[in-house]
Amino acid sequence: MAFRARVLTLYPEMFPGHLGFSLAGKAMERGQWSLDLVQIRDFATDRHRTVDDTPAGGGAGMVLKADVLARAIDSAGENDPRPRLLMSPRGRPLTQQRVRELAAGDGVVIVCGRFEGVDQRVIEARGLEEVSVGDYVLSGGEPAALIVLDAIIRILPGVMGNDLSGLHESFEGGLLEHPHYTRPQEWEGREIPSILTSGNHGAIEKWRHEEAVRLTRERRPDLFEKVESEKNG
């Protein structure tokens, strides 16, 4: 069964973006996943097609209206079982574990926020899961939605040519990925580590693991501490 993605946005022309190319694009052509785009503005009821209003209590910016967004969400039907994500800088950080969980399902509904934010009432009433792709603010949820979809699609069964290739990537197993090398053997005075051309697969795997541990300890001590606590736990 194809993975069904549904994206609610004020800028549907931003999709599929880069997902129309390479692995994701070919997977879409093969019918391994589909993308349904919903223009939120189509669910406004006034002649100006208004989707936002000033924040209650005052303040800068505009807020996406609960009634308009709710109608857009409900257009998929009452019994749509797919998780509903709201791209938001205040959301829980997206993790590889959550990506795997989403990829194991039938699909996902992603709401792309705009303006200052989304009326809290629709977040609660429609069970939106707020998700962040990093500690920074974007002009809208569309780039973040593309990131989420990219992470999901590439691990769908059969999308990558070698399903084992994803097992050694960063965050699989909790560690960052080890360094990579390819021919030529020597480049600008720098050699490929001899262990990688030794033919000793056990030693190669040991080296790769040690390098993954080293990089994780140096660059992401938060991840390293988590892995260590789980290992000792």
Curated annotation (Swiss-Prot):
Location relative to the cell: Cytoplasm
Superkingdom as given in the UniProt entry: Bacteria
Protein's GO biological process: tRNA N1-guanine methylation
Top class in the EC scheme: transferase
Enzyme Commission numbers on file: 2.1.1.228
One Pfam short name: tRNA_m1G_MT
GO MF annotation, one: tRNA (guanine(37)-N1)-methyltransferase activity
GO CC field: cytosol
Residues that hold S-adenosyl-L-methionine according to the record: G113, V133, G134, D135, Y136, V137, L138
InterPro entries: Alpha/beta_knot_MTases, tRNA_m1G_MeTrfase_C_sf, tRNA_m1G_MeTrfase_TrmD, tRNA_m1G_MTases_N, tRNA_MeTrfase_TRMD/TRM10
CDD domains, per database record: TrmD-like
Catalysed conversion reaction: guanosine(37) in tRNA + S-adenosyl-L-methionine = N(1)-methylguanosine(37) in tRNA + S-adenosyl-L-homocysteine + H(+)
Disulfide bridges in this chain: none
Assigned keywords, A-Z: Cytoplasm, Methyltransferase, S-adenosyl-L-methionine, Transferase, tRNA processing
Complexes and interactors: Homodimer.
Its biological purpose: Specifically methylates guanosine-37 in various tRNAs.
Record-stated family: Belongs to the RNA methyltransferase TrmD family.
NCBIfam families: PRK00026.1, trmD
The protein's name: tRNA (guanine-N(1)-)-methyltransferase
Biological source species: Rhizobium etli (strain ATCC 51251 / DSM 11541 / JCM 21823 / NBRC 15573 / CFN 42)
